[in-house]
C-alpha cells in the first residue's frame, strides 16, 4: 500500500512514520492518557492505496478529535495535526499570501479578481518587514479542533477552493484592514486577537482588508411610507443589505391593517400578511449566492395593530400556506400600557395606523394619551380582552420560540439616542436599539470580549486588563465606522451622524467556572455586575478620549450623556466602588463622547466556537454535546468539567456514559461531589428568575440591550407569563430573545388507532387544554411571587 506525498512522490505506508508524526505534536500533553499508537491503528484501518498525506492528516485529526472524551488533550492534539497540515499546505510569509490573494485570476473568465483591496496590499508591502515579523505562527496551535475547523470552513480566504490563509494571516489582514497605515495600532490589535482577548464580529473577520469591506453585523429600518412606493423602496433596501450579509430588523407598525381604505384605488388593503410574504420570499432569494447564508429579517410590530393575531400565526407549522411567512423572524415592540392591561385583565383596543396615526412615533405617557384618546373617539377597529391577546402571544412562543419580546418604553426611556426621536425597533438578535427614520437606516459594528481570559491563575479577576482591552475595541469599532462599505446611502448617513458601536461578551459562564463561582452564587452575581461596569467605564473613557481628539458625534447635544446622565442613572442604580465615576463624568462634560451607544451583548455563536468559549452571557446548556465530522458524530464533554473530573480521578468511560444517559446533567450522578454539581449546573437547572435578575443588574451598564434567551424545559403558560412580567418589572429592554425549550429525551411512542380517535374527543381535549393554559396564565398574573417560585 502506498501514500502520495505533497510533492507527488509515492511512498510505502509506514506505521512508525505516522506514529512519529503524531508523537512530535504531543509536546506538553498528558501522555498517561494520550496514545499516538492508538490513533495510528485507527488511521491505518481507514487507508487505501494512493491516499494522499493531506487525507492522512485529516483522518488522523478526526480520529484524535473522536477520542476527546477520553481526555481533553486529544482535542488539542487533533487541532495541532489539522493546523500542522494547513501550515504544510500554505505559504508562511504574510506579505506573500496577500500578494497571492491580490493577484488571483478567476479561472471561469480569466479576469484579475483580487480578493484583497489594492490599498491593503500597498500598506502590507510598504510595511512587510514589520508585519511579517510580528506574526507568531505558534498561536495557530492554540485553537481547539472545532474552532479551527470553523475558521477553515468559513473564515480563511481560499484560492480556487483551497485555503490560502492561516488563522494568523487572517487576523493580521483584519488588523491592517481596520487600521490602515497605523501599523502600531494594527500590531496591537493583531496581538490581542491572536492571544484571544477579544474578537471582532464575523462580517469584520470575513471582509476586512477586502475590496468590499462590509464589516457591520446589524441593520435596522423603519418603513419609508405606508404606500406601494414606501413598501417596495424598503424591500429594495432590505435586499441590498441582505446581499452584503447584514442581519435586518424592520419596523412595520405604520402599515395599514386589513380592510383599511385605500384612497388611490378606492379599494381596501390586504393588510400585513401578504406584504410580509413578499418580504419572506425576498429573504429566501437574496442569500449571498449559493445559499451561503439566507437573508435574515426580523419584523417588529406593536400589539395595538389590528393584524396582530394573524402576525402571531405567521411562523406556525400548521395552517394555510398563504397565511404563513416561516422564513422571517417576528418580534413584538410592547408599550407598558399593554402589560398593565394584561395584568389587570382589562380590554385592549386594536387599531389601524392609517385611521389612528402616530402611535409608533410616541412612547411612554405621550403614547398612552394618544392611544386612550383614539379609544375615547371610537376610532378602534376591534376590542379584545388584553389577556386574550396575551394568550395568543404565549401560545405562539410555546409552539415556535418566538415572537421576541422587547419593551418599547424601556428601550426609549433608557436610550442615549432619545433626543433623536422615537426608536421603533431592534435588530435581528434583539441587542441593538437605535433610531431609524425614512432617511436613516441604523447600523451597528460589533466585537466581543472573551471574559474567561481575564481570570488570573490566582483566581482573581483582572478588571484593569478588561478596561484596557475594551478601550482598544472602542477605537477599532470607531475606525470601522469610517472605513466601512455601506450597502445603502441611508446607512452611511446614520452611522456617520450618531456613530454607535456594540461591544458584547462571550465566555461569561467560563469565567464563573474558572473563578469557581456557581452561576447563581452571590459571588457570580457581583462579578457579573462588575464586569459590565468595567466594560461600560472603559468604553465611555475611550469614547471621551476620541471626542477630545475628533469632537463629539454630530447629534451629541441634547442626549442624556450630554446632560450628565449615564445608563445606570436612567436605571436609578448606583455602581459599586470598583471605579471612580466622578472624574470620568467631569471629563465627559468637558469633551463629550464620540459614540452615541457603546454596549450590546450579542449572541456569539460562531466566534465563541472559534475561541472555544461558551456563548455570550448564557449558562452552559449541557455538559455534553454532539459534534459531527466527515467520519461520523461523537460526544464532546464540557472541557472544564472533564479537567475537574480527571484531576479528581473520576473520569472514565462509565462516567462518560452516565453523563450521556443524564442528557448532559451531572446532578443525579452519586460519585460526583456537591461542589462540582453546583459549579456545573446547566441552564435547565438554574432558576430563570436569577438569569433575569442578573440580566437586569448588568442592564444598568448596557446602553443598547442584550440578546437574552429564556430557557424553560417544559414551558407552561403560567411559568412563561411569570417570566415575562418579572423581566418587564425589572426594567429589561429585551424581555426575551428566543424561548428555548427542551425536547423530551426519550419521547414515548404512542400508536393510535386513528379510526377510534373521534373528532369530538379531539375537540374536547383541545378545549380542556386551552382552559388549563388560561387558568395557569391567570393564576400566574394573580399570584406573581408564588408562581415565580414554582417557575424556576
UniProtKB/Swiss-Prot annotation:
Subcellular location: Cytoplasm
Positions of post-translational Phosphothreonine modification: 751
Residues at which dTTP binds: 226-228, 243, 256, 263-264
Site label Interacts with thioredoxin/glutaredoxin, positions: 787, 790
Gene Ontology, cellular component aspect: centriolar satellite; ciliary basal body; cytosol; mitochondrion; neuronal cell body; nuclear envelope; ribonucleoside-diphosphate reductase complex
Chain residues that bind ATP: 5-6, 11-17, 53, 57
SUPFAM superfamilies: PFL-like glycyl radical enzymes, R1 subunit of ribonucleotide reductase, N-terminal domain
Domain of life: Eukaryota
First-listed, main subcellular location of the protein, grouped into a coarse class: cytoplasm
GO molecular function: ATP binding; disordered domain specific binding; identical protein binding; purine nucleotide binding; ribonucleoside-diphosphate reductase activity, thioredoxin disulfide as acceptor
Site (Important for electron transfer): 737-738
Active site per UniProt: 427 (proton acceptor), 429 (cysteine radical intermediate), 431 (proton acceptor)
Activity-regulation annotation: Under complex allosteric control mediated by deoxynucleoside triphosphates and ATP binding to separate specificity and activation sites on the M1 subunit. The type of nucleotide bound at the specificity site determines substrate preference. It seems probable that ATP makes the enzyme reduce CDP and UDP, dGTP favors ADP reduction and dTTP favors GDP reduction. Stimulated by ATP and inhibited by dATP binding to the activity site, the dATP inhibition is mediated by AHCYL1 which stabilizes dATP in the site.
Modified residues (N6-acetyllysine): 17, 376
Residues annotated to bind GDP: 202, 217, 427, 431, 604-607
Pfam family, one: Ribonuc_red_lgN
Keywords: Acetylation, Allosteric enzyme, ATP-binding, Cytoplasm, Deoxyribonucleotide synthesis, Disulfide bond, Nucleotide-binding, Oxidoreductase, Phosphoprotein
Domain ATP-cone: 1-92
CDD domains documented for this protein: RNR_I
Annotated catalysed reactions: a 2'-deoxyribonucleoside 5'-diphosphate + [thioredoxin]-disulfide + H2O = a ribonucleoside 5'-diphosphate + [thioredoxin]-dithiol
Biological-process GO terms, alphabetical: 2'-deoxyribonucleotide biosynthetic process; cell proliferation in forebrain; deoxyribonucleotide biosynthetic process; DNA repair; DNA synthesis involved in DNA repair; male gonad development; mitochondrial DNA replication; positive regulation of G0 to G1 transition
PROSITE patterns: ATP_CONE (PS51161), RIBORED_LARGE (PS00089)
Subunit comment: Heterodimer of a large and a small subunit. Interacts with RRM2B. Interacts with AHCYL1 which inhibits its activity.
Miscellaneous section: Two distinct regulatory sites have been defined: the specificity site, which controls substrate specificity, and the activity site which regulates overall catalytic activity. A substrate-binding catalytic site, located on M1, is formed only in the presence of the second subunit M2.
Role summary: Provides the precursors necessary for DNA synthesis. Catalyzes the biosynthesis of deoxyribonucleotides from the corresponding ribonucleotides.
Protein name: Ribonucleoside-diphosphate reductase large subunit
UniProt source species: Mus musculus (Mouse)
